[in-house]
Amino acid sequence: MTSIKQILARHDWENPVVTNWNRLPLHTSMSYANERNKREIKQPRKSLNGPWQFSYFENLSDIDEEWRKKDLPTSKIIHVPSNWQLQGDYDVPVYTNVTYPFPVNPPYVPTENPVGAYSKKVFLDNKWLADNTESHVVFNGVGSAFYLWVNGEWVGYSEDSRLPAEFDITEELRAGENRIAVLVLKWSKGSYFEDQDMWRMSGIFRDVDLIRVPKTRFQDLAIETKLDEDLDDATVEVRAQLVGNSADNLSVTAELFYHGMSLFKATEQFGNRVIDERGTNDGQVSLELPVKNPALWSAEVPNLYDIKVSLHDGEENYQIENKKVGIRKVQIKDGLLTLNNQPLLIRGVNKHEFNSKTGYYVDEKTMIDDIRMMKEHNFNAVRLSHYPNASRWYELCDQYGLYLVDEANIETHGVKPMNYLTNDPKYLPLMMERVTRMVQRDYNHPSIIIWSLGNESGYGHNHDAMYQWIKNTDPSRPIQYEGGGADTPATDIIAPMYARVDQDQVEEVNSKWAIKKWIGLSKENRPLILCEYAHSMGNSLGGFNKYWEAFEKYPRLQGGFIWDWVDQGLLTKNNEGQSYYAYGGDFGDYPNDRQFSLDGLLFPDRTPKPALLEAKYCQQYFAFQLEKDPTGKVNYMTVSNKHLFKTVNDATLIYQILSNDQVIETKKIKLNLAPQTEERVSLNFSDNSNEDVYMNCQIVQDSTDGLIRSGTLLAYKQFILRNKPIMISDVRSSDDYEDFLINDATDSLSISLDDAIWQFNKRTGWLSNWIKNGQEKVLTPLKDQFSRAALDNDIGVSEVTNIDPNAWFERWQATGFNHLNEKLVQFNWTALKDEVRITTQHQFLSPIDQHIMFISSKEYRINHVGDLKVYVDVWRQVADPQPARIGLSVQINATTDAVTYSGLGPMENYPDRRSAAIRGKWDASLKELYTPYVFPSENGLRTEVAYLKFDHHVIRALEQRFSFNLSQFSQAQLSAVTHQHLLKPEEGVWLNIDGYHMGVGGDDSWSPSVSPEFLLSNDHYHYSFSWSNAEGEANV
C-alpha cells in the first residue's frame, strides 16, 4: 500500500507534464438510467454533499500518515461544497486582481503550501455493488489540485479546479462502510493558469457525487443540430461512443419528441460512421433525425425538444439517456454574428460563480434568481468569466433562455510578459486539456453560442493550437479571445475589453481603438463584441447610453458584456459580532487589491445597484417614437418590438399624460407585436395649461412568462411635451410688508422678520444660522463645496501597487483640492424696500501653495415672505484639475424622515447616468435616497430638480434646475470611512445643493473616464435657488 509520503514525493502539482492520474475522460452529462436501475435502485447517484471530516495542515510535510486510513482526533466537521477559508480558522481568503498571491516561479509553488484533508464515510449495500456495474466518484469543482484515496487505497490525482474529475473506484469499494478521503492542495502549477480577478480560496466547492454506471455504456453522447439556409429543415445528429464490452450486437436508438409527441425514431448499429480512408470506428455510431419546420431555440423563445437515446442489444437496455435539444444555427455571416439568420445584439454581463456566504458555491435557487433578474433587466447573454461553470447553470440557461460564452479556465495575467506561459510548448498539454475538456462536457448545450480560449493570457502559439482544435471539433460555433489585442488570428470576433466609443487608447503594444473606428479598419470585417465594458465598480456606469447609441447605429457593433454581475463581498463579522461585507485586505490578506472586488451591478446580497436600472433601460427591447402634425400637435405614437424572434402578445402598453406632476389621462392598450414590427397608436388628448406636461409610456408583462413575472416593467419612455420655464415670484402684496429688524454687529449680521432670524458671520462670510420660532434650522454654515467623497472611479486603482497619478483623486490630493483654505474678501449688505441683500466673495486657496483655485461670489436676498434666495457665481482659477461639483453644503436640523421632490427619479442619477430616470414628483425616505455602496462614497444624487421639500424646508429652483443629496452622513465621513457598517449617523441631515456635478464615469475604473461634456471645465458657473422654512404643510 503506497504511503502518502511516497505519493507526494512525485510533486505532481509542480510537474508540467502531469495534470492527472487515473482521471476518466470527460464527457457530456449522463443520468445512467436503465431498466435494471429502475428495478433495483431508484437513483444511480448518491450525493456526497453535506458534512465531511476536515483536518488542516499548513504545508504538505505536516500531513499525518494515519489520516490516509482514519480521521485524526483533531479533525472537525466542514460543509461541502464550500471553501475552507469560510468555515473556521483554517486560512484566510485572499483577494487580488493581477498579482499572484505567491512568488512567481512557474511551475513551482511555495513549500508552505496549505492542505485541506477531507474525508467522508459512505455506506453501500450489495445492490449498489451489483455485477456489470462500476462505481465512480465525481468531484465537480476542487481547487486547486487534489489526491484521492478510498478505504486507504490511493486512487488518483487531478488539477483544473473548474471542471469535473471522475474516478472509477469500483475495486476499492466494499459492502458496508467506505471512507473517501481527499487531500486538497491550495497551490499547484495550475494556479498559474487560474489568476482570475477574484477571491483566491480553496477546497471542495462544487457538488460531489457517487454514481453507479453500467460497464457497457456510452462513453460520450454528442448532439448537434443542423439547419438549411432557409431554416425550414433541420437534422438532429446523435453521435455516440461506446465504452465497455465489444460493440457486437449493440445498437443505439434515438427518438425525438416535441411537447410529448414522437416526431422521429432511428436505430443504428455501432461502426456505421466512416471516419477516414481506413473506414469506421467500431465503438462509434451516428444517427440522424430529420425535423420539418423546426421550432427554433433562442434566448427569447427557448424552444426545446426531448430526445431519448438508448443503448441496447435488442433484448436489454444497458443505458437510457434523456436529453434536451435546442435547434438553432450560429454563424458569422457578412461580418455579423447571427443566430437563425438574424444578427444578434448582445445584451451581456460577465458573471463569476460567487456567493457572499458560500464563496465559490452557488446553489440552484441562486442560479434561477440570477437568471430571472437578468431577464427582467433585459439581459440576454452571459460570459462565464473566466472558467466553465457548474453543469446545472447551462441546463437552466437552455431552459429559460440565455446566450452563453463558455470560457476556458486559463488566465496568466500576473506573469511578465503575459504570454510567457501561453507561448511555451511545455504548457500546451495543460492548456489544451482545459479547452478540450470544456468542449467535451458542454458541447450539447444550445445556450452556448461562443467558445472562449480564456482571459488575459497574452497571445501565444498555444492559443493557435487550441483555436484549431475547437474549429475542427466544433465548426458550429465561433471562438473569441481577447488576449494579444482582441483581434488576433485566434478569434473570430473582435473582443476587446474596455475599448471606448469614440476615444482611442494608444499603447506601445495592443492599442484599444475607439469601437466605431475599429470596425472600419482596413481588411477588418469581423463583428465587434466587447468581452468586458462598463466597469460597474461602486457608483459607476456613467456614459453607458453612449455605447448603446453606437450599438444601435452600427450593425457590426454587436453589444458587449458588462463587468460584472455581483459584488464579490464576503459576509463576515467583526470582533463586536457586527456583520459586514469584506473586501481585499479585510482578512489581513496580502497582496490585495482592496475594494476592486466590488464591481458588480448587484450588491453582495444580490439587491440591485442604481446602475442595473440604467442598463435595463438602455438595453430594453422596445422603442417609442412620437409623431406630430404640422401644427406641432402629437397625434400618434409608434411602439417598436426589437425582439428578433419573440411575438409580444402578453403585455400591455400603458401611457399617461401628466400636467404639473398630476395624471390627467391614462390609457391601456393590449399589444400584439410580431418580432421586428411596430404598432402605431392614436393619441387624442388636450391640455391648455401652461404647466409642465409629460407623457409616460410603459410596457408591462401581463402574466408570467418563463421566469419573467407578471407585472414586470419591460420597457418605458418619457416624452416632455411642454417644458415650463422655471419662475418663482413672491406671493404677498406690497401692502403687507413689515419692517426687517437688522442688527449689524462687529462679527455678525442678523436679520429678523416675524419669527425668523438669519445670522451671518462677518468674519467668515457664511450664513451661520437660521432660527425659526426659536429653533435652529441649520447646524453648520452654508458653505461652498467643490469636492465629493471619492468614487471608486475617482480613485482609479485596479492594483494597489500601481496607482495612476492621473486618477481624479490623486490629482485632487496633489493640489489640496479636498482641503481648500477659505478667504473672505468681501462682505456687504443693503436694505431695500422689498428685501435685504447680502453680498459676499470668497477665495479658495490650495493648502499646498496658497494658489487661488476658485472665487465664489454670492448674493443672498431675504424678502418679506421669509424666502431666502441665493445667487452664486463661481470662477475657476486653474485649468486642472476640474472640480467634482460646484455647489453648497449645510447640515440642517430635521425632525422627519419624509422627502418630496420634483425632478429626475426615482433612482439615484448623475449627469452622465440618468437615461433611466424620468421627471416626476417623488416621495422617499432618507434611507431610500441613500445608496449603500460597500465602500462608502458620494451617492444618492438626484438631478434636474425643480423643488425639494424636507421637514419644513422647501428649496425651489430659480433660473435653472439643481441637484441635491440628503444624507445622515457628511461627505467628510463618507471620505474617511472604509466600510458601510462603520458609518455613524450624524446629528441632523446633510444637504448638498449642486448647481453642477461632474459625471461618475465608468468606461473603466482605473483611468479617468468621464466624458468631456460631463466635466466642469468652464471658467464661470452660475446657479441659484430659493429656500424657505414654513411651519405646517409648505406649498410647493
Curated annotation (Swiss-Prot):
UniProt binding sites for Na(+): D197, F596, D599
SMART domains xrefs: Bgal_small_N
Cofactor note: Binds 2 magnesium ions per monomer. Binds 1 sodium ion per monomer.
The protein's Enzyme Commission number: 3.2.1.23
CC terms in the record's Gene Ontology section: beta-galactosidase complex
Sites where the protein binds Mg(2+) 2: N592
Binding site for Mg(2+) 1: E411, H413, E456
Catalytic reaction equation(s): Hydrolysis of terminal non-reducing beta-D-galactose residues in beta-D-galactosides
Cofactor(s) this protein requires: Mg(2+); Na(+)
Keywords per UniProt: Glycosidase, Hydrolase, Magnesium, Metal-binding, Sodium
Gene3D superfamilies named in the record: 2.70.98.10, Galactose-binding domain-like, Glycosidases, Immunoglobulins
Active site: E456 (proton donor), E532 (nucleophile)
One Pfam family named in its UniProt record: LacZ_4
EC supergroup of this enzyme: hydrolase
Alphabetized NCBIfam families for the sequence: PRK09525.1
Name of the protein in its database record: Beta-galactosidase
Annotated gene: lacZ
